[in-house]
């Protein structure tokens, strides 16, 4: 759970887990008592309605069946006159933990526990989890350890070139349900990825679902994602997702506070990479805006995590990768972000090739197989040209995005569960292509 207060309103977020301790159920309805004037800001894994002080959540088509011993979860962010009191909820008409299965079966069953559904409010871990024991070094961080930058190349603890290949989330606060262990484990074990990028929007046009609109809730969600990656022994990119405002220096003080918090929390974890400004735009120049901003933020991180890799965005939505060539940052273990969308940016490849040839450390922290809007048609031929070049050069990359939003760049079809173990039918054309590429290259 998380909570915050803004504009005289209380707010928070919950993830509720229903575990079936009895016979299989094929549908469920949960009811939660809520305070007055409760409004849902976002919700996932259920069909939600509010009447008076009761919020009703019914199953989606994909998560109605809960087998014995299995669990499902749903969640929501809200604003209200008061905070929601934590506690048990009702499931299928009965208080969770008593007899919330099929009532006729319950009445005829001598074992009162046979149809119990227990619902609990799930809280994130209070402390950072320990990295898993892996004496054979079979998972990414145990095998490759603290990464660094040498001669323009990302290298592992042994000084050997190492390429990160993975997925970026969409905005964490819009799709919080995808921040879960099963999803990330599927990316690691089935998609053959070694990194997850956590995109935390800073100030997305004033809708409140971003860091500036909900600092504590956004930070808690991001930390949940980082903790999961540490548990899974994966690398993770903490992305200060500057899209609005275009000039990252607008929120320099907030960025300092944020990176002080997260770099202190994760100081001893080689898993964590920091991306300090996603896509500067709107006239923000390298020497006039971005570099001076970076020179204020990098020392904050270095104080706590002196050896961490830091990615710095470049002008025009991280397309002008050449700008740092003549005016680089004077810090070790710094890389420069380049972003492309295959159906739009084919003309940028020669510039990238020139920068790499001159030894600029390039990290493709975001790319899409479609056009720059996130929509339109996929251009897999152009995507293959880009990724083949990156693989040859050992340049790391993350695909946008791991979510089920109804747009071309999503890897999951609308309505697909966030809980991993996805089948081929769950994937969009982009998802099928990306999974195949990551598994076979």
Where are these regions (language model features)?
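A mature extracytoplasmic/lumenal domain signature
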Residues: 34, 61, 78, 168, ...
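N-terminal carbohydrate-binding accessory modules
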Residues: 122-195, 212, 432, 436
